[in-house]
């Protein structure tokens, strides 16, 4: 996996883990798993539900759907500066003398 791919996956999975967000994980074969992300590494996600912890290989995952939105904060990356404000200036031509 490229470093760029990890820049998206790791903050997303880490936010799900830290905030204990319930997730639905859809596998490429259509099976739906539900639980909370307990841990993850480059190749697997540990998904915990009430009765068991499952090791799910990332190559088998199609989609991860959180039950609510999560705040993604990329580590080692400063927050974006506030967008600059655009001001529309109207110019009036003075009559020629």
UniProtKB/Swiss-Prot annotation:
SUPFAM superfamilies: Sm-like ribonucleoproteins (SSF50182). Disulfide bonds: none annotated. Residues 75-97 are annotated as: Disordered. It holds the Pfam family Hfq. The keyword RNA-binding applies. One of its GO terms (molecular function) is RNA binding. GO terms for cellular component: cytosol. The keyword Heme does not apply. Keywords: RNA-binding, Stress response. Residues 85-97 have a biased composition (Polar residues). Residues 10-70 form the Sm domain. One of its GO terms (biological process) is regulation of translation, ncRNA-mediated. Belongs to the Hfq family. PANTHER family: RNA-BINDING PROTEIN HFQ. RNA chaperone that binds small regulatory RNA (sRNAs) and mRNAs to facilitate mRNA translational regulation in response to envelope stress, environmental stress and changes in metabolite concentrations. Also binds with high specificity to tRNAs. Homohexamer. This is RNA-binding protein Hfq. It comes from Neisseria meningitidis serogroup C / serotype 2a (strain ATCC 700532 / DSM 15464 / FAM18).
């Amino acid at each position: 996996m490229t470093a760029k791919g990890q820049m998206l996956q790791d903050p997303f999975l880490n936010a799900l883990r830290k905030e204990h967000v319930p997730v639905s994980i859809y596998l490429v074969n259509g099976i739906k798993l539900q639980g909370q992300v307990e841990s993850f590494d480059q190749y697997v996600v540990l998904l915990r539900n009430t009765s068991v912890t499952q090791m799910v290989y990332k190559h088998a995952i199609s989609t991860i759907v959180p039950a609510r939105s999560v705040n993604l904060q990329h580590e080692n990356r400063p927050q974006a500066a506030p967008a600059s404000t655009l001001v529309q200036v109207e110019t009036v031509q003075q009559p020629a003398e």
